[in-house]
């Protein structure tokens, strides 16, 4: 993930290898992970590669979230690391990069459209 000195995201590059078990049952986790990378942040440039790795474990399949938890953890962890490196508060770096109401409807670089949302207001309601 690349940032300006002021903490604005300029790009995200993600190479994800997911354990699909002994044989693939569903591609939903990997395909959803691909689509869901980034939001609710305004990321001008993205390159995401998602691959499944066959292992000697039980096959995996979808339950709830299907890819969202994995990619959310990755992006939010990168936000925390960037905040520490730049010297910004964890909430402030998020606030600076959230999709604004003025940008709606917002199409992500990976094709999802957000037609509504008050992401900054929601962030103000919690303590990080």
Residue positions per predicted region:
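Gly/Pro-rich active-site capping loops and adjacent beta-alpha segments
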Residues: 1-71
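Conserved small/polar residues in nucleotide/adenosyl-binding loops
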Residues: 126-128
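Molybdopterin (Moco) oxidoreductase catalytic core of the xanthine/aldehyde oxidoreductase family
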Residues: 3-32, 85-124
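Long hydrophobic segments that form regular secondary structure
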Residues: 63-101
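General structural feature for long, well-ordered alpha-helical segments within catalytic domains
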Residues: 8, 39-42, 59, 71-74, ...
